[in-house]
Amino acid sequence: MRRSPSRSNNNFAVPNCSTNSNSSQQQLTTPSDDLNSNEPNDPDDSRSLPTIKKFNNKHSINNYNTLASAGKNNNNKRASNDNLLIPGENAHKQKIYTKDENLKSLYLDIDVSVAKALSSSATAPKLINTARTSSTTTATTSNNILTSPSYRESNYSSPSSYSFSSYYSSATSASSSTSSFLKSSGLSSRVKSPSSSVKAGSFGAPSSPTSGIPNPKSSKKPIFLRRYSHDTSSNEGLDIDVAIEKLLQVGESREITKTSKKKNFPFHSWEIQLICYHAREIFLNQPTLLRLQAPIKVVGDVHGQFNDLLRILKLSGVPSDTNYLFLGDYVDRGKNSLETILLLLCYKIKYKDNFFMLRGNHESANVTKMYGFYDECKRRLSSKVWKMFVDVFNTLPLAAIIQDKIFCVHGGISPDLHDMKQIEKVARPTDIPESGLVTDLLWSDPDPQVTDWSENDRGVSYTFSKRNVLDFCAKFKFDLILRGHMVVEDGYEFFARKKFVTIFSAPNYCGEFHNWGAVMSVTTGMMCSFELLKPRALKNKKKLYKTKV
């Protein structure tokens, strides 16, 4: 019987990145380099955490060409002019919070014991106001009514032709045209009262047994997405609290199956359209590079495993009490990508200051056409719904930094990344290009067998060595790189003297591997621990090999 990773009780401090390069080079050659308790023999993955910093974007990187094919093989040999940043005016200027200088000197302690929960009295991360140049207008209301685009669902168009009449606005910030997209607030202030009923035109809450996951609601400030923005007499729309509860109950009732038909899906297409529109607007109002503060919990790939996502919420806490950062790969491969991405987007709309999502390599039109999400949308709803989600994917942030110490990304690092401002200046919405910085952040992998940047056998981006990781951490003064992108047996796996960790949050991935799932918890004191999800019992167990996803 395989040894459970939860039996590990290994507390350690990640070395400070101020170590000089000479000593780092010497340590690399010592035999003890590969003796870490969870050191990978093959590439591994890791993810990101939340906090948003402040900067003024004067330029942005032009959008790249669309990724022609997710699995397209390229020689990965870039000409020097391919690495140049093309300046352009960025319409989405962001500001970043003022960091706490007292936290800069903290070491990053990691506890690999199982499921160390954060205190329920944890406070929300500090986030500072950010002004954004936008063609949208803010609806000044007292009950968080969000209006939809003026055009009809049948006329759904590309992102460039969107025309929003209003976007998410809290009652306390609506009086200012430069209101913040992320406000500092204590979690203790989020006391919810019983849910308000959904307006006409939306499905009522399911009659199935209530979910075991709490969904605190507020009758004072319900978040209501209005279907017809210019018709004030119409009350037709979607209550986000009702939408979340509906999804939680669907998961509890276990009625979601791969063969689910359109008539069984609990949302109308126009309701999904509303969710996508407003989530997209929130993402565009937040930076491409998030700068976050602890406490926070980081989740790796979930890949449409909706019931396992619910297990994560039960284990690590609901978003009303817990700050979250998801590292990408929400769809494809799993049976219930629609429920998974809808629940995450609903949480983003409801808890936009405390719930963060990064882009993974599967948040792409080409990849989702190959690995299941497109087919699921077409089978259960329509291809138009798939297009709505793709337009949201194109606005997702690319990376996050937690308290100046932890760099979070879906895939890995890039040889083209010389300054964090390069990430900040990436203009969104954007497709994933065939090569370059954006592609590397979402597709690259670590490889213990190489000594420098090498071709990736995925046919996209690069692989990088331990030396590349250590150099990256030293240059940017990071103590840890956290990413996902690859299934690992214990749910987490270290690389490069524990300066790099992969986390994967889909246990028993695809129903074929007996892997654990993991969530990384970071406290205010920068103590890190892993909360583990045991794989469900399998009739035919397969030996797990590190698999790129």
UniProtKB/Swiss-Prot annotation:
Its EC number is 3.1.3.16. Its cofactor is Mn(2+). The active site is at H362 (proton donor). It comes from the Eukaryota. InterPro entries: Calcineurin-like_PHP_ApaH, Metallo-depent_PP-like, PP1_catalytic_subunit, PPPtase_PPZ/Ppq1, Ser/Thr-sp_prot-phosphatase, STPPase_N. Phosphatase involved in the regulation of protein synthesis. Affects translational accuracy. This is Serine/threonine-protein phosphatase PPQ. It comes from Saccharomyces cerevisiae (strain ATCC 204508 / S288c). The gene is PPQ1.
